[in-house]
């Protein structure tokens, strides 16, 4: 495998910064730094584990490393957050300055990586103890050596809560049950029971069905919920075009396009106040999981770790027979386009 330029850049930057820090004096008697810099859904589903870390070390002692654009979410959840700007990931001098300030200001005694993988951040945190999952992906396995203690997941294909349980047991040094780290954030969000919210995007295009297929699902929604409005949410040009196509395919229907018209927390509120959520593998699907909001998840493969098996969520995947009738150059994935209207209708009926 050829290493991507970004990984080579990160490796060189981290090595040079690490060498520079050998000439700096940092104390290691200060805060607990917790790395949680990946996606929205990951942050939400790990919220109970985050609470347990705070309980163990005290809120005033625990700081979460998060990407700048997720800082508001972390603070909303009650965390002390250190924002990591995107520019600092690419610029050597910005990264050097940021890492120096973090080590100097917070004097970390422990670095806990609660993500499901590893990256170059671990190399430049100067802490007495650095604990996290050992990531054997070719491009990042070089960073495993910076841990003072690392571990592997018991089963690489296990469900996401089992992975979080593995992380929790290793960094908290306690035996845990899945129930111990089951997140419940209903108390954080306003809850209601009106409208149907559809998230029209995901982290990858092949996880999103064609608007032609979504049109058929929406027609089923209106049969069962004729009085409800449908609200489309998402962000970015691709999702704006997707929503536009849906409205063109279903004129004169009660469909409201909120794509690119809400910030993250406003989109969260639309979901938690809804009667039902429909979406692909995404942060909003995980929001339903942590708030017990009824929802339908559309998956290429329902065995993936993030397909939560709980009563308030119905996960539906492709039929055994692949449907090749959907012709869409923008959304051509045959698996996601093979989720039958019948299975969607059945999921609607079960959640009603």
Per-segment meaning from a language model:
Residues 93-99, 213-300:
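Donor-binding and catalytic core of enzymes assembling or modifying cell-surface/extracellular glycoconjugates
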Residues 43-54, 69-72, 217:
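Short amphipathic alpha-helix
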Residues 1-29:
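Positively charged, low-complexity intrinsically disordered leader regions
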Residues 60-94, 254, 315-322:
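Conserved nucleotide-sugar phosphate-binding/catalytic loop shared by glycosyltransferases and other
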Residues 133-154, 257, 289-352:
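Nucleotide-sugar donor-binding patch of glycosyltransferase catalytic domains
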Residues 34-38, 134, 183-242, 301-303:
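Active-site donor-nucleotide binding/catalytic segment of nucleotide-sugar enzymes
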Residues 61-68, 131-133, 230-235:
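Short internal beta-strands
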Residues 83-178, 195, 199, 204, ...:
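Conserved nucleotide-diphosphate donor binding/catalytic pocket of glycan-assembly enzymes
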């Amino acid at each position: 495998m050829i290493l991507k330029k970004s990984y080579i850049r990160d490796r060189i930057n981290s090595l040079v910064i690490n060498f520079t820090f050998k000439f700096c004096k940092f104390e290691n008697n200060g805060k607990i730094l917790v790395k949680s810099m990946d996606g929205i859904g990951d942050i939400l589903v790990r919220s109970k584990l985050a609470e347990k870390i705070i309980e163990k070390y005290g809120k005033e002692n625990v700081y979460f490393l998060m990407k700048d654009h997720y800082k508001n979410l972390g603070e909303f959840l009650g965390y002390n957050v250190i924002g990591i700007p995107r520019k600092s990931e690419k610029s050597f001098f910005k990264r050097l300055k940021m890492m120096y300030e973090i080590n100097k200001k917070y004097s970390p005694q422990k670095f806990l990586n609660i993500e499901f993988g590893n990256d170059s951040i671990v190399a430049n945190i100067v802490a007495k103890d650095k604990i996290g999952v050992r990531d054997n992906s070719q491009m990042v396995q070089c960073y495993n050596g910076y841990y003072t203690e690392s571990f592997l997941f018991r089963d690489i294909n296990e469900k996401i809560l089992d992975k979080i349980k593995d992380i929790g047991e290793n960094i908290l040094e306690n035996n845990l049950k899945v129930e111990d780290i089951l997140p419940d954030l209903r108390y954080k969000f306003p809850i209601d029971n009106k409208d149907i919210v559809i998230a029209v995007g995901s982290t990858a295009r092949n996880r999103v069905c064609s608007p032609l297929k979504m049109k058929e699902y929406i027609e089923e929604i209106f049969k069962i919920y004729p009085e409800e409005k449908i609200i489309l949410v998402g962000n970015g040009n691709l999702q704006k075009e997707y929503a536009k196509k849906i409205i063109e395919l279903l004129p004169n229907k009660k469909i409201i396009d909120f794509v690119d018209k809400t910030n993250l927390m406003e989109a969260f509120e639309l979901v938690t106040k809804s009667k039902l959520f429909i979406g692909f593998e995404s942060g909003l699907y995980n929001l339903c999981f942590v708030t017990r909001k009824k929802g339908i998840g559309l998956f290429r493969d329902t065995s993936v770790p993030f397909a939560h098996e709980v009563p308030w969520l119905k996960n539906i995947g492709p039929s055994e027979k692949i449907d090749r009738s959907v012709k869409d150059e923008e959304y051509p994935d045959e698996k996601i386009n093979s989720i039958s209207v019948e299975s969607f209708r059945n999921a609607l009926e079960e959640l009603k």
